[in-house]
Amino acid sequence: TFEIVKTDVLVVGGGGAGCRAAIEAHDLGSSVTMIVKGRLGHSGCTFNVGTSAAVGPWGDSKDTTDSAMRDLLSHGGFLGIQDLAKTLVEESPDRITELEKWGIDFQRNDDGSIAMHHASGHSFTRNLTFKPRPGVKFDYGILPGFAMMDILINQVKSRDVNVMDDVTLVDLVVNEGKVIGAVALDCHRNVLTVFSAKATILA
């Protein structure tokens, strides 16, 4: 037996990218279903490295997005896709501002300004550090992904997003060269679910 779920947008993955995609799709007026192969909030994104980098008013006034893009591409051996690198660099300041608006906390100086540091591979000081959520020890690692995911999960839960945990993608459903949904396995109930979606996002 199998079940059918209809949705405007199907998001596959519950990490940072998946949560942000679900938020955006919902805010644009779509019905959204997110399937997560484990539990929401327990993805690879939770173990994000110690800092995030973005050009903005918090950093060096001489820094530019062009400089950040050169650093990103050159230290990646020019293997990165330039269009994606450009999007990452240009969107990062707005995403940092958005996370701050949603309640994320940064390491700060005594005067209250965001504490910055100059990380390896960067031409300018552009690295910000999220404060870990309570209970995460600094000597174990800052793990800002926990802090970021807490914020994103709260935003997802505050919206009418249908989150389905422990559901694993089996295959995409394709008709005439277009993806029209997916087939997934509900691991708790051992039931196949067919998702009919106008758009499917692999996040």
Language-model segments: residues:
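Short, hydrophobic/aliphatic alpha-helical segments
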Residues: 29-41, 198-201
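N-terminal Rossmann-like FAD-binding beta1-loop-alpha1 element of flavoenzymes
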Residues: 9-34
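Hydrophobic/aromatic ligand-binding patch that stacks against planar heteroaromatic rings
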Residues: 20, 24, 44-45, 200
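Conserved N-terminal/central alpha/beta ligand/cofactor-binding core
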Residues: 37-180, 184-186
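Core beta-strand elements of the Rossmann-like FAD/NAD(P) dinucleotide-binding domain
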Residues: 3-7, 188-199
